[in-house]
Amino acid sequence: MKKRKLVFAITAITVFSAMMLTSNTKAQAAAKKTYTITPKLSPYKGKYKKAKGYYNSTTKQYFAIRSYLELLEKKGGGKLVIKKGTYKIPNVLYIPSNVTIELKDGVTIKKIMKTKAKKMKPSGGIFELLEPSKAKKKGVHGQYNGVHDVKIYSTGKAVIDQDYQGKTGQNCIALVMCHNRNVTIEGITFKNMKYGHFIEMDASQNVNVNRCTFTGYKASKRHTSEAINLDTPDKKTRGFTHGWSQYDCTPNQNVQITNCIFSNLEKAIGTHQYSVEKYHTDISISDCMIKNCVSGGIEMMNWQRVSLTNEIYEYWKKQ
């Protein structure tokens, strides 16, 4: 009798384990589901199409991509494949955790500063690494506990075009990251910057920027607009002004910038203000071409454990 009970117990445990494994596998499969975006695609299941004062032909592409990013947040992650074409983005698109975005050859993500919508104003950003559901909340993230495991890459020639947008008091930035970890940006051309940066990197850990090109600018008043800006979320310096941060002055840690081209810019990479005793650490820049930058190549303010390898610097413009 004892032997039968033991066999039954082992069998029950085995069946339960198999059920749990199957459940986990299904959950992982669901999280990794792929969705394809095209220039003419409507929002997921018609979401936002009846939003009067918001949805129109100018905002359609924005709401289409936004609806799928919101879907991926609910599903715990997944992949967006963005097909060839031009996508005009008037407002910020928030990217949640465990998301991969593949930009196909011929994709242009273009910043526009108009909506033609009565209830919706344009904003200066394009992408931000933050859960869409937390976009309007205050102080939700600190340290490196925000959105994680994000990859944005191109399989060919894809462009994020800031179109020289922005003005005093309203920076235009292609990608904002803060309180993030495990982020990869690869194979993308960023172009046409004014009043801002291409990448604003604050309080982020384990970031890899590889095989990207950063090019083109119109002069800002301060002449220190870096293509990639390393900063801290600090209320005193106001280097980061997004309310969802806890403003804990967390620096960046373990950043690798490799095989990139920086040309015709004010500055390639750097930090132009700092938080006291908060050091960006383990910063590696290798095999990059830096040319024609007005205010210099790399500014290492409050950096520790820095590695510069095989950089090539060419002719500097004078402002």
Predicted regions and their residues:
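Bacterial N-terminal signal peptides that target proteins for export
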Residues: 1-10
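Sec-dependent signal peptide cleavage junction
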Residues: 19-31
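Bacterial N-terminal signal peptides
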Residues: 11-19
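Short glycine/acidic-rich loop motifs that flank beta-strands on beta-rich extracellular proteins
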Residues: 88-92, 111-114, 162-166, 171-173, ...
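N-terminal extracellular ligand-recognition/capping segment immediately after the signal peptide
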Residues: 62-66, 76-131, 135-138, 158, ...
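Right-handed parallel beta-helix/beta-solenoid
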Residues: 30-65
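Right-handed parallel beta-helix
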Residues: 104-106, 148-161, 181-192, 205-218, ...
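Short, T/G/N/S-enriched strand-turn elements that build extracellular solenoid repeat scaffolds
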Residues: 65-73, 88-97, 111-113, 139-144, ...
